[in-house]
From Swiss-Prot:
The reaction(s) this protein catalyses: a 3-demethylubiquinol + S-adenosyl-L-methionine = a ubiquinol + S-adenosyl-L-homocysteine + H(+); a 3-(all-trans-polyprenyl)benzene-1,2-diol + S-adenosyl-L-methionine = a 2-methoxy-6-(all-trans-polyprenyl)phenol + S-adenosyl-L-homocysteine + H(+)
Similarity remark: Belongs to the methyltransferase superfamily. UbiG/COQ3 family.
Gene transcribed to yield this protein: ubiG
HAMAP family found in the cross-reference section: UbiG
Top-level taxon: Bacteria
UniProt keyword S-adenosyl-L-methionine, yes or no: yes
Biological or metabolic pathway of the protein: Cofactor biosynthesis; ubiquinone biosynthesis
UniProt cross-references to Gene3D superfamilies, sorted A to Z: Vaccinia Virus protein VP39 (3.40.50.150)
Function: O-methyltransferase that catalyzes the 2 O-methylation steps in the ubiquinone biosynthetic pathway.
Enzyme Commission number(s): 2.1.1.222, 2.1.1.64
NCBIfam families, alphabetized: UbiG
Tagged with keyword Cytoplasm: no
Name of the protein in question: Ubiquinone biosynthesis O-methyltransferase
InterPro entries in UniProt: SAM-dependent_MTases_sf (IPR029063), UbiG_MeTrfase (IPR010233)
Amino acid sequence: MTNADPHELQKFSDLAHRWWDPNAEFKPLHDLNPVRLGWIDAHAHLAGKRALDIGCGGGILSESMAGLGAQVKGIDLSTEALGVADLHSLESGISVEYEAIAAEAIAAREPGTYDVVTCMEMLEHVPSPGDIVAACATLVKPGGWVFFSTLNRNLKSYLFAVIGAEYIAQMLPKGTHDYARFIRPSELASFVRATDLHIVEIKGITYHPIGKRFALSNDTDINYLVACRRGA
């Protein structure tokens, strides 16, 4: 059985045609992308590396990693989003390979293949996030890097990421997030400990409304990033 929620898939498929519009529903991803890309590259040094972007959607991060010299494959279960990603790759001239396949399926097919595996803003949208973490650990080469980003589960994150972002500021479409699926850092750490990955760094992401920009911080109360490495 696929580790996916049909409602979640349909939600993002319906918006796929707007994925690359920096002023539409995915504006927060466009604004966030330089921060997460710089953080990933600082750890993994992407140039010349083979990277897999799990839950790539329309390819914002995938193309950015390829632009830094990585050989990138993006996977997603939304064929609509992948169609947009493919088209944008052709238009931009940045080469990325895309495939509609589940993380667990590609892990069974290509274990220990990638220098870098990214799974950003995805874990909070699937029924069994621990299985995705395990798949990431299988896919990465010994000594390779795995990166996650997700949302913490607490009152502050509910107020800011759901009520604030979706209903007050309208930065995101209503219903984008299901608070019950938010993941505490301790929970994500337990998923990681069940694999042969180890956590190297956890960083928060803070949004500055005056400048309308995201920045790395030590505040993990809402959005946070986790860098992991597989034992050599």
